[in-house]
């Protein structure tokens, strides 16, 4: 069995060792998974695995062991592949069994040929996910992962920087002149496809249903390949992820950490184009029908590498400062949580002061911003999401950079965020809702395809008079549904499919927001800096990195604390609410009680308390009273509704 760092540089050799020992006995697959699982438990082993998020693709060796932090953007149809196949040596007639798992290209000797009629060939199924880097991931998160990674990599001799930078058009240019490439793979790498597994053998073609493709000249070579990122300006690799076990556990928009084998073999581009040419000759009509689908589902490996997953973990969060799984009863995790909780009070006080300065001296608005940032949908009762707390910060100065810089502050605190500038042009032209493209058989992303716990900051101060067209109205409706029901209805043309979500929405506006919000707090600045950018920059630079990290841990950790209300406090709250209704029957409603309970929940958690106390309930009532009084005062000043 290979040892040392072979599991990192030559994982297929490890797999081959288990396969050779066990043959067709399926136990070898479990042993492979167990082997890599144990390897990753060794001291700091995950930090030695090169990450596609941090390491340029051209620095990674093909067929090496890699990891990838990503979101499932789409799920393709399951595909069949040859789990075990047999080859025959043309000279000696010797038969050899090979495994097809974790491979796109079957490696055969120059004298070997695939025996399609072998009774020992087995066809298995695997699932393909289209995965993209986590949308809106903050710069500080990326930097922390980069600094933690200890993988030693250098430019791959078989994968040069020029390949990495080549566009989709260049890939097709290469494929239009395949002789230069094919000469490198002559004999041992003649193209073929059986059951989803590309294979090499003698120079002859084998066509199956899986290889029915497209005409090369039907491609739109003038436009670059669309990596289908949900948010504009996103960078990083998209990957086709091949999953072999337990794929039913995952769903679209899940955040995953994957460990697997990288496949970037240039021969994949040659094979795909050969299949297009061959299928065009066999059935031009069928080829035309599937051209776009073939382009999307089989992009050049230099642009969209493949990862054959050995281990996959669904991530609760992407904050690199915390243990990956906070629900585990591991001593290390418990020790981390208890240690941080013991110093929670000063961290909260410092964070409140920091946000008070960011909100121009308004400590009440800072309190509500903290409550908003730690809120989360903890459960659903029928269609009602419980725990969400959308805040509308009204009174923001118009034609000012305040909202832009406030978003920068939030970016420095949360792991993932996006600022939506709510202009008429953006509302009318941006794609908010993901939709199904049946021609390409893929889910085309939209701005609202975001993973759980993303902070979405909607800036209404940029909104001017204008006309919303039909797409604009649909986009406003989508935002309203997201805020109210924490769901996005994806467009599948013939029907809509509901995707539940857990997005923290924070709205900045001059007057009352056009969108529904759980809570409106009117900003009362205590100071107006002459230079907003200079003020906010000095605020950020004054905070020590260690303190900033404590803020980040605080805001992520508190979302995952269990919370409950005792029977005694429940009875006290009910009695209190009845008394409030007696005193003010017109303005106190059941919705007000619900909001008070949400505020009390977040307030308790912000103090590290996992159960509601009488003291926190009274403090929640006090905060709500101050907020309502402020709104009434502002309404009297303006003479209109806020």
Swiss-Prot record:
Modified sites of kind Phosphoserine: 154, 167, 298
GO CC terms in record: cell junction; cytosol; nucleoplasm; nucleus
Molecular function GO terms recorded: chromatin binding
Keywords from the named record: Cell cycle, Cell division, DNA replication, Mitosis, Nucleus, Phosphoprotein
InterPro entries, per the entry: MCM_complex-bd
Record GO biological process: cell division; DNA-templated DNA replication; sister chromatid cohesion
Compartments in which it is found: Nucleus
Polar residues bias (residue ranges): 151-161
Superkingdom of the organism of origin: Eukaryota
Phosphothreonine PTM positions: 160
Pfam families on file: MCM_bind (PF09739)
UniProt-annotated stretches for the region Disordered: 151-197
Chief localization: nucleus
Summary of subunit composition and partner proteins: Interacts with the MCM complex: associates with the MCM3-7 complex which lacks MCM2, while it does not interact with the MCM complex when MCM2 is present (MCM2-7 complex). Interacts with the RPA complex, when composed of all RPA1, RPA2 and RPA3 components, but not with RPA1 or RPA2 alone.
PANTHER family for this protein: MINI-CHROMOSOME MAINTENANCE COMPLEX-BINDING PROTEIN
Function in brief: Associated component of the MCM complex that acts as a regulator of DNA replication. Binds to the MCM complex during late S phase and promotes the disassembly of the MCM complex from chromatin, thereby acting as a key regulator of pre-replication complex (pre-RC) unloading from replicated DNA. Can dissociate the MCM complex without addition of ATP; probably acts by destabilizing interactions of each individual subunits of the MCM complex. Required for sister chromatid cohesion.
Family: Belongs to the MCMBP family.
Name of the protein in question: Mini-chromosome maintenance complex-binding protein
Gene that this sequence comes from: MCMBP
């Amino acid at each position: 069995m290979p040892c040392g760092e072979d599991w990192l540089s030559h994982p297929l050799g490890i797999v081959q060792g288990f396969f050779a020992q066990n043959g067709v006995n399926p136990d070898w697959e479990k042993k492979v998974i167990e082997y890599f699982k144990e390897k990753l438990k060794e001291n700091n082993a995950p930090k030695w695995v090169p990450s596609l998020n941090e390491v340029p693709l051209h620095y990674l060796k093909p067929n090496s062991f890699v990891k990838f932090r990503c979101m499932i953007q789409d799920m393709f149809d399951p595909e069949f592949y040859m789990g075990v196949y047999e080859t025959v040596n043309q000279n000696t007639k010797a038969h050899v069994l090979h495994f097809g798992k974790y491979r796109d290209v079957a490696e055969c000797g120059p004298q070997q040929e695939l025996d399609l009629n072998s009774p020992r060939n087995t066809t298995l199924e695997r699932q393909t996910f289209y995965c993209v880097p986590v949308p809106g991931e903050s710069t500080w998160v990326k930097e922390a992962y980069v600094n933690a990674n200890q993988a030693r990599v250098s430019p791959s001799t078989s994968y040069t920087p020029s390949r990495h930078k080549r566009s989709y058009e260049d890939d097709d240019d290469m494929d239009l002149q395949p002789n230069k490439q094919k000469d490198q793979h002559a004999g041992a790498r003649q193209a073929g496809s059986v059951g989803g597994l590309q294979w090499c053998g003698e120079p002859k073609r084998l066509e199956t249903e899986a290889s029915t493709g497209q005409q090369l000249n039907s491609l739109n070579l003038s436009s670059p390949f669309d990596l289908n990122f949900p948010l504009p300006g996103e960078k990083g690799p998209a990957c086709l992820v091949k999953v072999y076990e337990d794929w039913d556990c995952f769903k679209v928009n899940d955040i995953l950490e994957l460990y697997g084998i990288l496949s970037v073999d240039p021969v994949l581009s040659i094979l795909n184009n050969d299949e297009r040419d061959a299928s065009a000759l066999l059935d031009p009509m069928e080829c035309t029908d599937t051209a776009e689908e073939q382009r999307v589902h089989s992009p050049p490996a230099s642009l969209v590498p493949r990862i054959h997953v050995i281990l996959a973990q669904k991530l609760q969060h992407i904050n690199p400062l915390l243990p990956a799984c906070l629900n585990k009863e591991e001593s290390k995790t418990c020790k981390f949580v208890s240690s941080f909780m013991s110093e929670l009070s000063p961290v909260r006080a410092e964070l409140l002061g920091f946000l008070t300065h960011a909100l121009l001296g308004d400590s009440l608005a800072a309190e509500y911003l903290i409550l908003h940032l730690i809120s989360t949908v903890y459960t659903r009762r029928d269609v009602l999401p419980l725990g969400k707390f959308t805040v509308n910060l009204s009174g923001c100065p118009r034609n000012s950079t305040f909202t832009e810089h406030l978003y920068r502050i939030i970016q420095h605190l949360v792991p993932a965020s996006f600022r939506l500038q709510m202009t008429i042009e953006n509302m009318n032209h941006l794609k908010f809702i993901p939709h199904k493209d049946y021609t390409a058989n893929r889910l085309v992303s939209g701005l609202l395809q975001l993973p759980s716990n993303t902070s979405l900051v909607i800036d209404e101060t940029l909104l001017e008079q204008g006309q919303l067209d039909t797409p604009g109205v649909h986009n406003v409706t989508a935002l309203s549904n997201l805020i109210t029901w924490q769901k996005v209805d994806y467009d599948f043309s013939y029907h809509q499919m509901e995707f539940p979500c857990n997005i923290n929405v924070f709205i900045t506006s001059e007057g009352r927001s056009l969108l529904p919000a759980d809570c409106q707090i009117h900003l009362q600045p205590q100071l107006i800096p002459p230079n907003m950018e200079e003020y906010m920059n000095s605020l950020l630079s004054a905070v020590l990195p260690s303190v900033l990290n404590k803020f980040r841990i605080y805001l992520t950790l508190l979302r995952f604390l269990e919370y409950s209300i005792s029977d005694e406090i429940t009875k006290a709250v009910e009695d209190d609410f009845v008394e409030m209704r007696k005193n003010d029957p017109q303005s106190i409603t059941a919705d007000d009680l619900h909001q008070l309970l949400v505020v009390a929940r977040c307030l308790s958690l912000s103090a590290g308390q996992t159960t509601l106390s009488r003291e926190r309930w009274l403090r929640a009532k006090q905060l709500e009273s101050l907020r309502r009084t402020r709104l009434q005062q502002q309404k009297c000043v303006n003479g209109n509704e806020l």
